[in-house]
Amino acid sequence: MFNSLMNFWKGKDFLSQVIDDFSAMLDHSENIFTMVSRALLENDKPENLKDTVYEVDKTINRLERSIRLRIVEHLTLQPTVDTSMCLCLMSVVKDAERIGDYTKNLFEVIELLEKPIDRATFDTYFNGMNDNILKLFKDTKKAFIQEDDAKAKATYQLESRVVKECDAILINLAASDLSTNEGVCYALIARYFKRIAAHLVNISTSVVLPISQLDYFDEKMAVGYDAPK
């Protein structure tokens, strides 16, 4: 399906702009995730971080609306175009928008914390998960923008690991002696990490999945779904 989509894009000026805008959405999301993670885990918090996070989130939302409008206008003017291609685009831009929302939620955890995170304690539970999510950002963009099937399939495996680790974190937190504040904040971080990873993989797997299966990757993983060969 995705090869047809890329052929469809060729020579289409408006879709070239759509891809540029979508790439910008992913870049903005990765940038604020990096800033928020640094503030959360290293207590490296610029004074204007809150304003930056909220402004970038608004930018991501504007890009999503712009992309959707272009697609609708194109379908109106050229109704014979293969609509499944446009449905794919509509789906992945929503995933990109949700990543921005969850990153904003992650920032809000910083405001809930009574004291800065103890990195050693955090690593006991999360074991470098933030680095794995940053890798997912990069691999997702490469998979989608560069039509990299191998990279898309690799994200299946990494996201599966992140999901299982997030579920295990919640079990461990429930049995821990952390303070209520720490326990709740760590649980929220695990939840947001899991959702960010899931939306990233929804995007990357649009390269290898048919349109009818988009957005159901995390449910398939829960029942032992295997990535396409």
Predicted regions and their residues:
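Cytosolic, long alpha-helical scaffolding segments
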Residues: 1-229
